[in-house]
């Protein structure tokens, strides 16, 4: 019996190694190019934030005007970093969970290069003043067909791997991956058609753009982050997911509430009143999947606090899940009728967006990257100090942005609503908030310079040649990354 088990384990190791080897180049390409785009996006965010409280900053460069640099900043973060990090996570996770090698690595790699070229072209056009001006869809109209084609070429192979997998259970992570893979083209094509192809009323364009902005996070970035979390939590701890039923409830609650978000941005606009309030209700109800997922993941890792503290992947993932719960709580507080009157035209919305994109998605993506990269490069991370600095500076930076923007935005909104005060008083309040946000972006820049450098060194295969993972504390005899066999993250553990 032991000899049979040993043979099965050997075959399993060979299969995992072959899967990792087949995906090494495309996955590392997406992670490293995404990290470079993230560093650029943070630099642009630093400049955009500085211009809000110091308008004379860099006025000698017309291509760094406030409107241009702000649009380029968010576009680089979403399409340069966010989508590419998601691509790397999706194709690796789906291959591992489907237990199928990738046979189209070259095609995926070429599509990745085309994606980067399209994003670069779009960012340059924005900074030349030739963007569309549509929120989260700032790229010129000719860029979107290229991006949609590249997306199809990159992700179709993951759907094929799932289809041809051996019969068996569908993992919790695969629910979210499949949902995100299918939801993104739906929302992207719908928004592209209504915004760029149909000659509709500008108010329709504004509404569709607001819907796209809300659903891009809830129906793509969030499912990818949760898929990664549901994979890493049982994998690193060596325990199954706490409750299958809670996982199912969290998935379907996100699927039901997520598509309604976004329209809350149109409160007070001349649109049917049920639209913005349906969007606000959706954002309030997002607390339900946040609590369900947070409770499930926390109960999965509870009792393994030492593993969470030592494992880079699990530490980032746990931080991302906690911030997802914070995101849900803030959704409730900021989308009531009295709150929306104060936050509609203030810093608050920006802070809330950064909490979702960086606090939830990016931290979970960092956790996945710290887990995946050693397996596809066959090298361990060089420095635990780099990882620690990346974690603490990231957590401090994103927390500071959210606190400054949300709290400062509410006081800014109160100043706008108080007609007895001069407008200059409100502008002074906004300026004080801007300084805090700018300082926080500086911390994020430091964090991601460490991350980008570390990742580039791993891509060059300059990591440590060791069978022991790089831990955030001194090494101990147990492996905090768990056994390399597939952990059943579909079955329910006893309470």
Regions found by a protein language model. Name each.
Residues 164-167, 239:
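Alpha-helical transmembrane bundle and helix-membrane interface signal
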Residues 195-207:
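Short, flexible helix-coil linker/hinge segments at the edges of structured domains or between repeats
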Residues 12-27:
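Cytosolic juxtamembrane amphipathic/interface segments immediately preceding
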Residues 27-53, 66-100, 104-129, 142-162, ...:
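Hydrophobic cores of alpha-helical transmembrane segments in multi-pass integral membrane proteins
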Residues 303, 307-310:
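Long amphipathic alpha-helical scaffold segments
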Residues 133-144, 169-173, 204-212, 272-282, ...:
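Non-cytosolic membrane-interface motifs at loop->transmembrane helix junctions
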Residues 1-12, 474-495:
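Short, intrinsically disordered terminal tails adjacent to the first/last structured region
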């Amino acid at each position: 019996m032991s000899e049979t088990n040993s043979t099965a384990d050997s075959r399993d190791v060979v299969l995992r190694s072959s899967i990792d080897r087949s995906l090494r180049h495309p996955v590392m390409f997406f992670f490293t190019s995404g990290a470079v785009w993230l560093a650029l996006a943070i630099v642009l965010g630093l400049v955009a934030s500085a211009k809000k409280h110091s308008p004379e900053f860099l006025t000698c460069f017309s291509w760094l005007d406030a409107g241009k640099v702000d649009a380029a900043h968010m576009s680089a973060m979403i399409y340069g970093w966010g989508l590419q990090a998601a691509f790397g996570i999706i194709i690796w996770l789906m291959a591992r969970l489907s237990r199928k090698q990738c046979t189209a690595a070259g095609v995926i790699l070429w599509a990745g290069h085309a994606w980067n070229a399209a994003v670069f072209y779009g960012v340059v056009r924005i900074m030349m003043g030739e963007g569309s001006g549509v929120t989260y869809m700032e790229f010129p109209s000719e860029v979107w067909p290229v991006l949609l084609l590249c997306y199809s070429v990159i992700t179709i192979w993951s759907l094929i791997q799932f289809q041809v997998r051996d019969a068996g259970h569908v993992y919790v992570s695969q629910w979210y991956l499949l949902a995100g893979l299918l939801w993104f083209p739906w929302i992207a094509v719908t928004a592209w058609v209504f915004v760029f192809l149909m000659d509709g009323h500008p108010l329709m364009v504004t509404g569709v753009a607001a819907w796209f902005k809300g659903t891009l996070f809830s129906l793509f970035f969030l499912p990818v982050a949760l898929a990664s979390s549901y994979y890493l939590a049982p994998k690193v701890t060596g325990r199954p997911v706490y409750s299958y039923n809670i996982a199912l409830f969290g998935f379907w609650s996100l699927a039901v509430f997520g598509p309604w978000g976004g329209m809350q941005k149109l409160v007070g606009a001349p649109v049917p009143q049920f639209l913005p309030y349906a969007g606000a209700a959706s954002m309030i109800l997002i607390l339900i999947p946040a609590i369900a997922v947070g409770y499930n993941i926390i109960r999965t890792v509870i009792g393994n606090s030492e593993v969470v503290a030592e494992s880079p992947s699990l530490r980032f993932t746990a931080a991302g899940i906690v911030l997802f719960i914070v995101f849900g709580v803030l959704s409730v507080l900021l989308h009531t009728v009295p709150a929306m009157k104060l936050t509609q035209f203030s810093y608050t919305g920006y802070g809330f967006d950064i909490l979702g994109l960086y606090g939830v998605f990016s931290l979970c993506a960092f956790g996945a990257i710290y887990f995946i990269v050693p397996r596809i490069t066959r090298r361990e991370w060089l420095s635990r100090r780099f990882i620690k600095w990346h974690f603490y500076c990231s957590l401090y930076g994103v927390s500071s942005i959210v606190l400054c923007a949300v709290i400062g935005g509410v006081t800014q909104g109160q100043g706008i609503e108080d007609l007895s005060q001069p407008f200059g008083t409100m502008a002074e309040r906004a300026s004080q908030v801007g300084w805090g946000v700018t300082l926080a972006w500086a911390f994020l820049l430091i964090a991601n310079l460490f991350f980008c450098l570390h990742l580039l060194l791993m891509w060059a295969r300059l990591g440590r040649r060791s069978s022991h993972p790089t831990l955030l504390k001194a090494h101990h005899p147990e492996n905090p990354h768990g056994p390399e066999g597939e952990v059943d993250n579909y079955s329910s553990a006893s309470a």
